[in-house]
Every structure is written in C-alpha cells, then in structure tokens.
Amino acid sequence: MKKILILSVCLFVCWALPAQQQRMKVACVGNSITYGTGLADRATQSYPVQLQKLLGEHYEVENFGKPGATLLNQGHRPYTRQEEYRKALDFAGDIVVIHLGINDTDPRDWPNYRDSFVTDYLNLMDTFRKVNPDVRIIIARMTPIADRHNRFLSGTRDWHGEIQTAIETVARYAGVQLIDFHEPLYPYPSLLPDAVHPTAEGAAIMAQTVYSAITGDYGGLQLSPLYTDNMVLQRDTPLLIHGTANVGEQV
C-alpha cells in the first residue's frame, strides 16, 4: 500500500511540474508608472498585477518597475544601473513589456542626451535577447503627461512628443510590437491626478492594452466609441470607419 501511495505521489508531482514550467513569463519593465507609484495599494492595483489577473494561471507576470528610471544610459537614473534591471534579466522572460521614457523628459536628460535614445533603447532590448534569444519584446508609447505638470510648457510637452517619435523609430528599426498607452488615457486627465501617475482605473486600461497585445483578444469586432446612436453621416460619400477586432478575425 505504501509503495502504491509513493508511486501515486511521484506520478502527480511529475505531471504537475511540466505544467508549472510551461507558464509563460512576462516581465514588465519600466519606471514608477509600472511600479505603481501613487496607487492606494500597488500590490493589487499596479498594471502588472492587474495584467496577471487578466492573463490567468498560464502566465507569470512580474513587476520590474523602478521609480525615476530613465531609458537614457546617461540620464539621471538609468534603468540599466538599477537592481530591477538585473532582476529582470535573471527572470529571462518569454515576453518583455517595456514602458520607459517619461523620466527622460527631465531637463537634465533629453536636451543633453537625446541623440543616444534610439541606440540605448535598441541596446536594452538586445540584453533581454541575450538571456532569452526567443523573447518577444513589446514596447509602449508613453502614457500622457497632463498640462498640470509644473514643467509642461517649459519643455516637457515638446520633449514628451519627441520621445514618442523616437520610440516609434525604435519599433520600426527593431521590428518589435508597438503598443499605445497614450491614446486610451489621453482623453481622461482625471486618471492622472498628479499629472503623471495613473489611478487604479488608469492602470487597468494599461493592463488591458498589454493583455490584448499579448493574446490578440481585443474584445471582438466593434466600432470605435466615436460612432454613437443617432449620429449623422454624410450620404453618397465614402467613409473611413474605425474599429477593432481580434487578431486573425475576418472583417
């Protein structure tokens, strides 16, 4: 009887271990916005935590956000010199989601080192490829900075736009997936109470954006919210209709 019990336990463990090992590892790399600064409870409200809930048990999502981190290696707090970066490399994620650039709008950084941004970003991605050659990298257009920010008109607004363009350039050069954290948050400045850090609701929007990018699930075929009941459309004129659909869905 004891031998049968031991054999049963061994079989269960041997069956369970491969299931655990098959979990897809997702590394969320970023700054204080990824970390969850400003949230009442970052342990339950940060976007990586909410992403874990959306993706479910077949994924393992880890938060490697570092408050104040810059993408620029010559910035005032380079991400590549932080402990979170070393932990992210050790994690060797199957998927790496990068949201950096907000802190590079600092007047100490972008005006002086902007020419290094694209190269530094490409090099950062290469370090993740070295620890996992099969890694899937997703990079994000930055979340908005509201006009309440104390440096908004003295450079931050323009530099933020320039960095967005640089991030798009990085995506083209590297051939990686580009997602947009800016557009879904921009219409709702109330979700950025300190002008920079999203609320729990804002973090949920970020999590949903990443979830859709990873899984291809965009909620099925649907029109843009711009199109509402009883809206007036011009007749006898070709119209460009916007909307979303799941990846691979026939429209």
Predicted regions: what is each one?
Residues H99-T105, D126-G161:
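Active-site segments of SGNH/GDSL-like serine hydrolases
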Residues Q22-C28, I33-L122, D158:
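Conserved SGNH/GDSL esterase-like catalytic core that processes O-acyl groups on lipids
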Residues L55, V131-P133, Y173-A174:
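Helix C-cap/helix->beta junction micro-motif
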Residues L39, M142-G220:
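Catalytic His-Asp segment of secreted/periplasmic serine-dependent ester chemistry enzymes
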Residues G219-V247:
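Non-catalytic, glycine-rich low-complexity segments
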Residues S116-T119, N123-K130, E162-T169:
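Alpha-helical scaffolding segments of alpha/beta enzyme cores, especially the outer helices
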Residues M1-Q21:
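Bacterial Sec-dependent N-terminal signal peptides
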